[in-house]
Amino acid sequence: MTDPTMHDTEDKKAMDARLARIEGQVRAVRRMIDEDQTCENIAQQLSAARRALDRAFYEMVSCMIRHEPQGADKVAELLARFG
């Protein structure tokens, strides 16, 4: 069994855009820390970044399932390890 990849150009573009937004969120957190913003505000931004990263992860898992549905054991293993 080979590992599935993101072959669809639109899927790649969507994932790249998603990751760029996450990158921006993380930069915002770093800036907030430098600017001595409240812990509550920083935690809120971290929570948003974490949720966005989780969505990106589950999109990758979805890609695996769509491209190789018979690889359910591997998907289950990855979810147990990283999910």
Model-derived features: positions:
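Solvent-exposed interaction patches of small proteins and small membrane subunits
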Residues: 1-83
